[in-house]
Curated annotation (Swiss-Prot):
Pfam families: DMRL_synthase. Catalyzes the formation of 6,7-dimethyl-8-ribityllumazine by condensation of 5-amino-6-(D-ribitylamino)uracil with 3,4-dihydroxy-2-butanone 4-phosphate. This is the penultimate step in the biosynthesis of riboflavin. Keywords: Riboflavin biosynthesis, Transferase. InterPro entries: LS, LS/RS, LS/RS_sf. It comes from Nitratiruptor sp. (strain SB155-2). One of its GO terms (biological process) is riboflavin biosynthetic process. The gene is ribH. Belongs to the DMRL synthase family. Its EC number is 2.5.1.78. It is an enzyme of class 2 (transferase). GO terms for molecular function: 6,7-dimethyl-8-ribityllumazine synthase activity. This is 6,7-dimethyl-8-ribityllumazine synthase. 5-amino-6-(D-ribitylamino)uracil binds at residues 23, 57-59, 81-83, 114.
Amino acid sequence: MRIIEGKLRLDGSEKVAIIASRFNHIITDRLVEGAKDAFLRHGGNEENLDLVLVPGAFELPFALDKALSAQKYNGVCCLGAIIRGSTPHFDYVAAEATKGIANTTLKYQKPVTFGVLTTDTIEQAIERAGSKAGNKGFEAMTGLIELIDLYKGL
């Protein structure tokens, strides 16, 4: 049996976009820093990294669709932080952002990763943005790097 999997490497020519929500920017700024760090550590060229900022997580699928339709990116890393409040708003935003990103990924058949935190508390979000639980932005970018390499090999 032949095993096909992506490697954690870039050759410097890959063009990548990070699409991040500004809402909860105290968290998303850290996620972006982690994603950028992963991109550069694994051979990415900073000139080939674009940061697209949208108002909130609900707008991520729109920007993702626009970025992928332009056909200039090898992959896109989506980042956001949705923190539960006292109303059902969290459930709607989390569900629609997730569904929109998944549907857009399948529509364009390009590597996309989901680095959108969905947490019950701000403390949980902080833990996942570079504190106790690592940086999920870094993890989302390393996943994207592997997918880009896998995409080239399939």
